[in-house]
From Swiss-Prot:
It comes from Corynebacterium glutamicum (Brevibacterium saccharolyticum). It is an enzyme of class 2 (transferase). Gene3D superfamilies: ArgJ beta chain, C-terminal domain, L-amino peptidase D-ALA esterase/amidase. Belongs to the ArgJ family. Keywords: Acyltransferase, Amino-acid biosynthesis, Arginine biosynthesis, Autocatalytic cleavage, Cytoplasm, Multifunctional enzyme, Transferase. It holds the Pfam family ArgJ. Pathway: Amino-acid biosynthesis; L-arginine biosynthesis; L-ornithine and N-acetyl-L-glutamate from L-glutamate and N(2)-acetyl-L-ornithine (cyclic): step 1/1; Amino-acid biosynthesis; L-arginine biosynthesis; N(2)-acetyl-L-ornithine from L-glutamate: step 1/4. Its main location: cytoplasm. Substrate binds at residues 150, 172, 183, 263, 383, 388. Catalyzes two activities which are involved in the cyclic version of arginine biosynthesis: the synthesis of N-acetylglutamate from glutamate and acetyl-CoA as the acetyl donor, and of ornithine by transacetylation between N(2)-acetylornithine and glutamate. GO terms for cellular component: cytoplasm. HAMAP family: ArgJ. The record marks 182-183 as: Cleavage. This is Arginine biosynthesis bifunctional protein ArgJ.
Length: 388
């Protein structure tokens, strides 16, 4: 077994290959297979109403609470391709199911890459044959994590060791990150023996406070998908709280790695809001600031410009006392009661990590944190070139 990643838990194998879908010639297809003895599965998907064909197919197939294998391709999102896109997604599922001796409904499928281009089905089907060839499936979690990358600069794996059972995972995504997950594909695996209901509760709880609070550029992908597959191979059934904690730890670690590798990132920024009526209002306010381009530019310039924070948060759908707002950068007060604090302009933000804390002054119990990044020259360069 691997020390980390999707094949760290018992009962899982993976493979990866280069099918020629990516123009770069880098590996671009991966396969994760649950060998059992159990096949419980949970998933969460994008909330974007314009969702990709693989999201539609995976939603249908996971509805019965079981998935035995998940197919990944990178370099083509198979999104906004109409009926042909759905036909292609279903064809890939059928091809894989036939090769593995499974039913179509046993398969999840995930795609990431450019929107609006048809899948090269000849390459995809040949890639499926390579992924399922004799000897291909094994302890190849690291290779699978590399194969699903698009504009990522590093692969992202995790592992959480519990009391006799394990949660592993891989993820990708560095841009188009906003609430409702990110341009993000994540696969979590566990050898715990759990029901589908337990898995869904753990996954939903974890994503709500990890991936859903990662907001790099305010864009929500058409393809966001997080799977949690459970093999039961450890023979151990954790409590719901134990499962929740392990899945949260895995999601939190991957989310931190997504933030650290965000497109063009030079600053990792945590925006925390307190002092509003409830947590929903707090996250609205934190997200409003995290998405503000002037604020993000100030972070890029290591500029403790608290005025941009106030200007942004004042537009948030949250209860606040406009004359009692306080702002702290790295625990140093820069604004108290909506007025500049002594030494505010001298606060050092030259480090890579910046914590921003905003108190909206109502004495309410709402609080939330959103993770974001700065807005750099490199981000613009990367995304101006990522097209046809």
């Amino acid at each position: 077994m691997a020390e980390k990643g999707i094949t760290a838990p018992k009962g899982f194998v993976a493979s990866a290959t280069t099918a020629g879908i990516k123009a770069s010639g880098n590996p671009d297809m991966a396969l994760v297979v649950n060998q059992g003895p159990e096949f419980s599965a949970a998933a969460v998907f994008t909330r974007n109403r314009v969702f990709a064909a693989p999201v539609k197919v995976s939603r249908e197939n996971v509805a019965d609470g079981q998935i035995r294998a998940v197919l990944y391709n990178a370099g083509n999102a198979n999104a906004c391709n109409g009926l042909q896109g759905e036909k292609d997604a279903r064809e890939s599922v059928s091809h894989l199911a036939q090769n593995l001796g499974l039913e179509d409904s046993d398969i999840g499928v995930c795609s990431t890459g450019l929107i609006g281009e048809l899948l090269p089905m000849d390459k995809l089907n040949a890639g499926i044959d390579q992924l399922t060839a004799e000897g291909a499936l094994g302890d190849n979690g690291a290779a699978a994590a590399k194969a699903i990358m698009t504009t990522d600069t590093v692969d992202k794996e995790t592992v959480v060791f519990a009391d006799g059972w394990t949660v592993g995972g891989m993820g990708k995504g560095v841009g188009m990150m906003a609430p409702s997950l990110a341009t993000m594909l994540v696969c979590l695996t566990t050898d715990a023996s759990v029901t589908q209901e337990m898995a869904q509760i753990a996954l939903a709880n974890a994503t709500a406070v990890t991936f859903d609070t990662l907001d790099i550029d305010g864009s929500t992908s058409t393809n966001d998908t997080v799977f949690l597959l459970a093999s039961g191979a450890s023979g151990i059934t954790p409590t719901q709280d134990e499962l929740n904690d392990a899945v949260y730890a895995a999601c939190s670690d991957i989310a931190a790695k997504l933030q650290a590798d965000a497109e063009g990132v030079t600053k990792r920024v945590a925006v925390t809001v307190v002092g509003t009526t409830n947590n929903e209002q707090a996250i609205n306010a934190a997200r409003t600031v995290a998405r503000d381009n002037l604020f993000k530019c100030a972070m890029f310039g290591s500029d403790p410009n608290w005025g941009r924070v106030l200007a942004a948060v004042g537009m948030a759908d949250a209860d606040m006392e406009p004359e009692k707002i306080s702002v702290f950068f790295n625990d140093k007060a820069v604004c108290l009661d909506s007025t500049g604090a002594p030494g505010a302009r001298e606060v050092d933000l030259s480090g890579a990590d910046i914590d921003v804390r905003i108190d909206l002054g109502t004495s309410g119990e709402g609080q939330a944190t959103v993770r974001t990044t700065d807005l750099s020259f490199s981000y613009v360069e990367i995304n101006s070139a990522y097209s046809t």
